[in-house]
Structure formats: structure tokens, C-alpha cells
Amino acid sequence: MKPAPFDLLRPPTLAAAVTMLAEAGAEARVLSGGQSLGPMLNLRIVQPRVLVQVNHLPALAGIAETPDAITLGACVTHAAIAAGRTPDLGDGWLARVAGVIAYQAVRNRGTIGGSLCHADPAADWVIVLTALDATVVLQSTAGIRRMKLPDFMVGPYATALVAGEILTAVSIPQRPAGATWRYAKACRKPGEFAHAMAALLIAGTTRRLVIGALGTTPVLLTGKQASLDGARAALAGLDAVDRHLQLTVVRRILQEADA
């Protein structure tokens, strides 16, 4: 398995990367950790003419914390988050998610931005950051725009990124004291993709329940619908076995949140 021929560009700055992407247009792909894009290249699922490598750019590895949000550059790795080298929410919420992504070798190279751009329906960050009401920051030669994840994820393996645009950061709102968060997934063995997964945020009057690994975009339930009954209704069209597994995961996190 070998990829189709391509040109590999290594821009010196983020501005240069954006210019390169604009010039190449739809024939370009961004290369960060390569943990998802690499296999797709080898299988020739994607055949870009140009790859723009960005994981060496300091502008995409930035980490910032304010009273309102934690902002992580797109090239911050899962391993850095799992090791506590970034700010976190609550009692290590983000570190616990990063620590169960695939295997250590993947966590060492894989990035939070790359995971979101790959938009796998069973990706941990896709589900968790939707529950946490995160915002992605996108940049192109036309400027910068910000987008909530439900708007960014337009389908399985599909995002709202346009040609020449790059995801530069993700901003995660801080949570008030007393906020509750739960996350669980069902895998055949550790490190594999989940067959069922759900994340829950309860912060004051806010309730957000996200169900993933459905083969589509995540299901987001809010308010009173962020409940077992709401999940039952939302998953009514699933195969009976898949629905049972998904509802088991949802029931688990709801029970843990109430404990």
C-alpha cells in the first residue's frame, strides 16, 4: 500500500501555511500527526496533490487559559493532554479522555485538531468537545471564523472546512464549581474504536448529553431531553442490538452523574 504521488510542503509560519493552502485549493490536505490521514493516503482513499505539514508550527501548539475558556492549539497532542501538560477542566476531565484514545504511539503523534478535522463518528474528542460546548477557530486568507462543533461536523468524516482553510485552535468553556461531567464508551478491547459512546455535562441548569459511534454526526440532547427517555427516542431507529448497547452506556453515565 503506497500513496499516490504528492508534494510535501513545510511552511515556516502559519501565514505561509494558509497561503499555500489557498494556492493549492481543493487539491491540498493538511498534515498534522498523520494518524488518520496516513492510512487514508496509503489506501488511496484520499489522493491530494499537495500536503501542507503543520505540526512544527508554534502558532498551532499554543495553550492559553482565561477565566472564560481553555484554548488549545490544533497541534497539541493527545499525549500532552493526557500527561497534564495543558490546563484542564474539573478534576482532570480532558486528561482522562486523552488517556483512553487508541494507544500510546497514536497519542504521541495524534493531535486534537487533527481528530476534529478527521470527524470520525466514533472519535473521543468529537463526542466530548461537543458535550463541553467547544468552539473551533478556522483561518484562511479571507480571515478567521469561529464555529460550534455541531455546525462544524456536517457528516461522517466531513466538516464545514472549505478549501484553503485550516483549523487553528479549539476553545473549551470553563465550568462553574459543582459542574458534573461523565464520559463512557464500549469497545471490544482497549484502544479500539468504540461501538457505543456518550458524554454528559451538567452545569447548573445546563444539561448536554451527546451520543456517538452512530456512523453519523453525534446526537446532541439538551435540557430535559438529555435523559434516558430522550436517548431512547433519539435512537429509536437503530438496530436493536446497537440501541441496547448505546442505551447501556447512556444509562451508566446518567447513573454515575446522579450518584
Where do the PLM segments sit?
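C-terminal structural segment of proteins
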Residues: 1-259
